[in-house]
């Protein structure tokens, strides 16, 4: 009778039956061997990524200064001044008021065709400034607002030419074929569990590799 060989435990089972396989796969030693196998494989992949990044930096493909200043922009010129946030917010508020009502209130148009005149509403229903109504009180002058110079950024936005923060490095896109490696996983339970562990481990290694690159950049300055 053929026996079942477990690739993760490197051993043969006594019988090749579904019940024996299920019992073996639910065992503590088998689960530990599966976790150790995929953890070791992910460490090798992360080390290869670190080696490739270091080699690219030494070859000059990665610049020494990861935050270069964009030339020809107002925000990066020496001696350029940035307006305080309060002035920028006041200017944006004033611009919003002008844009909300770009056209002044027009007078009433001609009456309907035929020469008839429209009967005005009684004074109680007329708005301020209408015929027969009391004059509207004078408006209080608003605060003096300063408009931002050309090239200034709106409130809540970075000024032109400001350096952007580096995005965290993303790990490789994992597929079932890539995760399995040289062996084939025979149970969907192990696939789901291994993928969960691999995602966490990949994020940790990617962050560590990014720190190694930045430390190397700082040492080379």
Swiss-Prot record:
It comes from the Eukaryota. It is found in: Nucleus. Residues 100-168 are annotated as: Disordered. One of its GO terms (cellular component) is U2-type prespliceosome. A zinc finger (Matrin-type) spans 4-36. U1 snRNP is composed of the 7 core Sm proteins B/B', D1, D2, D3, E, F and G that assemble in a heptameric protein ring on the Sm site of the small nuclear RNA to form the core snRNP, and at least 3 U1 snRNP-specific proteins U1-70K, U1-A and U1-C. U1-C interacts with U1 snRNA and the 5' splice-site region of the pre-mRNA. PANTHER family: U1 SMALL NUCLEAR RIBONUCLEOPROTEIN C. Component of the spliceosomal U1 snRNP, which is essential for recognition of the pre-mRNA 5' splice-site and the subsequent assembly of the spliceosome. U1-C is directly involved in initial 5' splice-site recognition for both constitutive and regulated alternative splicing. The interaction with the 5' splice-site seems to precede base-pairing between the pre-mRNA and the U1 snRNA. Stimulates commitment or early (E) complex formation by stabilizing the base pairing of the 5' end of the U1 snRNA and the 5' splice-site region. This is U1 small nuclear ribonucleoprotein C.
């Amino acid at each position: 009778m053929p026996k079942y060989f477990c690739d993760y435990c490197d051993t043969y089972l006594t019988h090749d039956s579904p019940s024996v396989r299920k019992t073996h796969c639910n065992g503590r030693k088998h689960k530990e061997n599966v976790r150790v196998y995929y953890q070791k494989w992910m460490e090798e992949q992360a080390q290869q990524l670190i080696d490739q990044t270091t080699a690219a930096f030494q070859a000059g493909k990665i610049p020494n200064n990861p935050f270069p200043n964009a030339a020809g922009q107002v925000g990066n010129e020496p001696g350029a001044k940035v307006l305080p946030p309060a002035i920028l917010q006041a200017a944006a508020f004033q611009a919003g008021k002008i844009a909300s009502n770009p056209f002044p209130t027009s007078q009433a148009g001609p009456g309907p065709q035929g020469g008839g005149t429209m009967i005005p509403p009684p004074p109680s229903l007329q708005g301020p400034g209408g015929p027969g109504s009391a004059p509207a009180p004078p408006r209080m002058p608003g605060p003096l607002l300063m408009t931002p110079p050309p090239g200034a950024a709106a409130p809540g936005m970075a000024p032109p030419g400001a350096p952007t923060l580096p995005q965290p490095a993303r790990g490789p896109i994992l597929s079932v074929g890539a995760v399995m490696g040289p062996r084939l996983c025979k149970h969907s339970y192990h696939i789901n569990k291994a993928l969960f562990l691999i995602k966490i481990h990949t994020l940790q290694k990617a962050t560590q590799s990014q720190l190694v690159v930045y430390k190397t950049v700082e040492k080379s300055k």
